[in-house]
């Protein structure tokens, strides 16, 4: 208790020093009422925001002097009543912006303005936003109206709005933790593999300094749920037990939304093991909530006890702080975080950690792709500083060369045409996030030029995930952005795509004699509607299944891919039935969201600055070892391929 009181006193002193600087630099007519840390930001509450806004450089100057991210918010006393404020906003903003919703958050003095053309709400050089602030006093926050309505995005916004008071209290606690005075000068850094080392699944990496503990990813291996020791990260690691027991974990950072990287997050809240901040990009927050909900629904439908409850996912939402690419934030007294594009799925990020005052810099790639795809730009390879690189090795084997993307697309269309010609159906199992949208873009283009004339059905979470993609066009590839913004055409909205609403529609598609293309989750045939399609379509030789993504060991997808022709499966009444696989089985690996062997080696060649050390993870044992050996031989860089529970001292 004495320790905590001491730290609180230290933060109060830091804030007193900051107030002295702010009071000196900010004009008195701004009428400052409160200054407080909220998350990684310093928030200044004022009665007259326009006194600060009229000087466009003041906030920048303050940030430089204080070396903090600054936000200015209106004092609650000066806020115009919501009804009057809403009327004024509609008068100020051009009708062409097409505002679809306005919502007020009194606890932080923000007004959320949802518009189809957010740029017009912002105005040239932010002029319209400043005018809104001057007239209504509320701090405007502008978001894009998704062209496809997403229930996930709507529910997240509702939660953040209704829980705003608790969230403000939470952010203040986080801020005080971040800006506490360090007890120690940073002298050493260690990383420990809690999952995803020499394996694919349950990724979890613990970064430790003598001041801080930060966890990067916390996933679940859905293919191993019958064996918790292989499915979950290593809760049994002594240092991790200690960190959780003592409440010392400063932050969790999520690289992307796939369950093997974020699937265990709500579990921590269910059992009160963590109450701190989660950092990720806005699309990742939305997508991981979608996939976590889908995960427990599939568990329930399979008669299993879900790992966590919807209210635990709600806690994840309340504790998540989003960052866009390139934004630098302090997340503990000695660790600064920046997220960079990883090119794997929407919102996926390479985590860059700047530790100490230039002591050490780590980049953790998560899953990444180093060539441009239809959906995304290639992964970032330039960092301000870099000593240690932790990189994935999913396709790190010497022979893991994927076919060129153009050839993969040609092969996909060829298999589809051959299947349709003989009156069959094409099943493409795909992760709801990433591969599904990549394949959709290929099929949309070919359909537009008359190459495909059969319906394309989207089942599982794919349609909702696609709706989230439409809400974040700024995260998509340059070509897609040009199509959407300059050409006024959004390929995600094409009429060729038909979402499957329920099990009855699904059965009608299966029973129909008409050819069709079906894209369904999950991508590895582990739960979800893709399993039901497979059961009923597999016996017919007219049909085809096309795998376009990695099939992990232990999954039904891996069994089918490896050529097993008779597969025992549990039916609806709990009886085991043998499914005969007479359908054609194809694997087209050119659509993978993972870098292949050439891309991995090319990334090492081009990453700047060149790291002193590379650690290979997220791959089968031999692939991690093979990649590490090859990097050392070719580039002379020190490499390691550690096991789970190994700890490596970086400094």
From Swiss-Prot:
Alphabetized InterPro entries for the sequence: aCPSF1, Beta_Casp, KH_dom, KH_dom-like_a/b, KH_sf_prok-type, MBL, Metallo-B-lactamas, RibonucZ/Hydroxyglut_hydro
Stored Pfam families: Beta-Casp, KH_TffA, Lactamase_B_6, RMMBL
Region of interest (Metallo-beta-lactamase C-terminus), residue spans: 593-651
Region: Metallo-beta-lactamase N-terminus, residue numbers: 188-398
Keywords noted in UniProt: DNA-binding, Endonuclease, Exonuclease, Hydrolase, Metal-binding, Nuclease, RNA-binding, Transcription, Transcription regulation, Transcription termination, Zinc
Region described as Archaeal CPSF-KH domain: spans on this chain: 1-200
Residue pairs linked by disulfide bridges in the UniProt entry: none
Single GO MF annotation: RNA binding
Cofactor section: Zn(2+)
UniProt region (KHa), positions on chain: 12-79
Cofactor descriptive note: Binds 2 Zn(2+) ions, which are required for nuclease activity.
Matching CDD domains: Int9-11_CPSF2-3-like_MBL-fold, KH-II_CPSF_arch_rpt1, KH-II_CPSF_arch_rpt2
Annotated segments matching region KHb: 80-147
Enzyme Commission no: 3.1.-.-
Top-rank EC class of the record's enzyme: hydrolase
Positions annotated to bind Zn(2+) 1: 256, 258, 344, 367
Chain segments carrying region Beta-Casp: 399-592
Residues reported in the UniProt entry to bind Zn(2+) 2: 260-261, 367, 618
Assembly with partners or alone: Homodimer. Interacts with RNA polymerase (RNAP), interacts with the Spt4-Spt5 complex.
Family recorded in the similarity comment: Belongs to the metallo-beta-lactamase superfamily. RNA-metabolizing metallo-beta-lactamase-like family. FttA subfamily.
Function statement: Terminates transcription on the whole genome. Termination is linked to FttA-mediated RNA cleavage and does not require NTP hydrolysis. Cleaves endonucleolytically at the RNA exit channel of RNA polymerase (RNAP); the 5'-3' exonuclease activity of this protein degrades the nascent RNA released from RNAP.
Protein name as catalogued: Transcription termination factor FttA
Organism: Pyrococcus horikoshii (strain ATCC 700860 / DSM 12428 / JCM 9974 / NBRC 100139 / OT-3)
